[in-house]
């Protein structure tokens, strides 16, 4: 089970990097408005998806750690 936890922690690190980059992309877009306004939904959806995956992985990790 510790291998599962280690694998999940590695996945969380990668997901965290993606979520952070998506957050920065959204922030950059907000500073460029109104230029680029047509990409708001696309960038926001990407950011939402990245954070959704990150938080789901964190919940799986909590569940695994409770079972140890």
Model-found features: residue ranges?
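N-terminal acidic leader/helix
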Residues: 2-29
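Short, charged, intrinsically disordered terminal tails
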Residues: 4-7, 62-68
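Hydrophobic alpha-helical membrane-spanning segments
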Residues: 26, 57-61, 68
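Short, charge-rich amphipathic interface segments used for partner binding and complex assembly
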Residues: 31-63
